[in-house]
Amino acid sequence: MRIFNQTEIRIIGCLIEKEVTTPEQYPLTLNALTTACNQKSNRDPVTSMSDSDVLDSLNTLVSERVVTDETRGNSRVAKYQHRFCNTEFGSLKLSKQEMAVLCVLFLRGPQTPGELRTRTQRLCEFDNVAEVESVLTTLGLSEASPMVTKLEKEPGKREARYAHLFCGEVINDVTVVDKTNVTNHSNSTENDERITLLESEVAELKAEMAQLTQLVNDLLA
């Protein structure tokens, strides 16, 4: 399995996400892709990559055919799309749910099954958390190479987190917390997740408006 660096995996995650959520803007220009990489919503960590940072990694991914330049006709603006999975001659074939789970793990880092169910809503549908866990099990038992791993449960959390392995082995960063805070933290988890989802949806709408504005500017350039 190809091991990517953090910038490369952020680019791949953004291209997968935007292919589904904003198909009218896909493939993405360099400016739109940089904006997507640096979104404040649905990104952890939040980054401040330059166009040059993104382009350097894009050139590597294009040379390896993980990403392709889809510039057509007389267009002066390069546009990029991923070939990470489900290509005609590629070996990595993923279901819509599997691709959505990996996409969120690429963009947000380790997640619990409950968080994944919430945060994949714009990419696919899961009927329940058990369905997410089934997909994670499938990804973890891939015949070619495991694509996800289960981390140790964090103190105060009801669910263990899962991480992708496309950037190599994951060091489990379980945080030690004061036992007196565990109960309160556990009780507030569901409310925090609902608030986070609403904030994320508002921020994503703002980001998509910014990308649409950038697309119009690119077309008028």
From Swiss-Prot:
The record, for SUPFAM superfamilies, names: Winged helix' DNA-binding domain
Per the record, the coiled-coil ranges are none
Q: Which domain of life, per UniProt?
A: Bacteria
Q: Which family does it belong to?
A: Belongs to the UPF0502 family.
**Which PANTHER family does its entry note?**
UPF0502 PROTEIN YCEH (PTHR38768:SF1)
- The name of this protein is UPF0502 protein VSAL_II0605
This chain's source organism reads: Aliivibrio salmonicida (strain LFI1238)
